[in-house]
């Protein structure tokens, strides 16, 4: 393992995420490093990539605790993430992509991403149980998307006016078109 790379990542995360405490930032760096090495986001796979940090079960448990830590201010961390991504790209007119993805019939994710070199960098998202009227966000699809986009826009410089792209199922709603004007 390239520990120097992990330490540089940890220092950069501490600098870019001032809302996180030192240990929270190190936990994020460890999770990111495991993700980068394994190119998978399953906690057990990430833990396999980090043997220098302890036994497999110890590292896996550490990652699980970090992910479920209620003391992490997710809203601030997302804002800081968006600002970091934006400062690294410097687009004049960014393209934001809105997409809803369902993972079988268990989980759905509504996500706003930044289109970059043929890829999408996730900026902000909301997860909920798929195919369940009770668990679907109460505000409905239009206000959910509007809220996610508003969160992204609040982190961008005031002069930036991004283009928004979404698939037909989301974009052809008259309520959506009114909300985005």
Regions found by a protein language model. Give the residues of each.
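Conserved, well-structured functional cores that handle cations and Mg-NTP chemistry
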Residues: 1-181
